[in-house]
Amino acid sequence: MVWSVKYLRKTGHRFLWITSPVRFSQKRAGDSNGPISIYVAICDHFEPFWGNVYQEIAEHRVATWCREFSRASREHTDFLGNHPKHTFFYSEQDYNPLLLDSLQKLCRDGYGDVELLLTHHDDTVQHFRHRIEEIRDVLFFHHGLLRKDNNGNIIYGFIHGHWALNNSRPDGRKCGVNNEIPLLKQSGCYADFTYPSAPDITQPRIINSIYFAADTPGIPCAHQRGYAAERECWSDNDLLLIQGPLSLNWKNGYLGLLPTIENGGL
């Protein structure tokens, strides 16, 4: 028991989301009278040069992904005959034309999709806008990735590196820009897929939800507040956040006294 108290004192900030009643997605599958469509999303923080490996290792990683996933995907279809697709949130700092061309072929064959992952630190509004617009345009015009909406604008899904969306770390590291919501919206971001991040300190109090967040000028962590997304309801100004699952796992707890966190990580 003494050990448990010490553990809570040291790591209690990681569990603040547990006390939050904010869960917008309350509707259960049994509430529907019609057919139910189930969507499974795998949001891969794809960094082929992870661990500062050489080009040859990064090429091997991408080649293996393309070969093995397409082989596995061909064996499965949904009721419409579509094969599973893997979504690569490609790291902007790992940009490499050869690797992206390999992923483009996988996407063209119907087995994948590419979105954006951006990591930055101590950044400015101008520099962040330049980076996100530059990688967006390069992926679309040079590699045939991403897509356009009905108005002809390039759109993309987004994951923030180190989960520090809207400068959400208390120490201000791993970001530096308080108002990322309007910058993302203006550059074509249709949704953010960053969370959950627990047990990291960046975890929002809103959990297990699909919701919109409005910007709060000059104030960080605007996505800590929001309103539920609804069918046939869209916002041109507020950012859509699509969260993965987050809950407590009592079956694999610490010494049978404290739960672990289930955050959907693979």
What is the predicted function of each stretch?
Residues 103-143:
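Substrate-binding cleft of extracellular glycoside hydrolase catalytic domains
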Residues 2-28, 144-266:
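Active-site-adjacent pocket scaffolds in enzyme catalytic domains
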Residues 56-74, 99-100, 128-142, 173-183, ...:
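Well-ordered, non-membrane alpha-helical segments in soluble/globular domains
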Residues 80-83, 125-135, 196-202:
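Noncatalytic linker/hinge segments flanking ATPase motor cores
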Residues 1-112, 120, 154-163, 182, ...:
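Active-site beta->alpha N-cap acidic-glycine motif
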Residues 48-50, 94-98, 123, 199-202, ...:
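Flexible loop/turn segments at secondary-structure boundaries
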Residues 78-81, 140, 144:
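Residue-level recognition of short, structured coil/turn motifs
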Residues 96-100, 126, 168, 204-205:
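Short, solvent-exposed polar/charged micro-motifs at secondary-structure junctions
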